[in-house]
Amino acid sequence: MSMLSRLLTALEHTEGVEAVTLHANGPQSAPGVAFAEADRVAKNWDLGACLQVYIEAEHAVLLDDVGDGRCLRLEGASGHYGRWRHAVERHRPLIGRMHEEVA
């Protein structure tokens, strides 16, 4: 099992998570568009750069800018932001070493 597979599997075991993907964060990708808009709002409010976007509706999505033009996407049940964020932070050193192909 590759390091990427182990990482995604570990994150999928976080409570409420139904799917995890790692994306190239291009400007036309859905995560890229969400980050661009969130970054625009953050800068307008003098908050600095946007590092994470959490969207909660019937389902929830957490987008995390992991660097190198990549975005980690967790999707699942609403109401688990704290757990998801903790899981991403706990795995951040491994994510930073990840140089495999992304979606």
Describe the residue ranges of each PLM region.
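Acidic, low-complexity cytosolic segments
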Residues: 1-19, 23-103
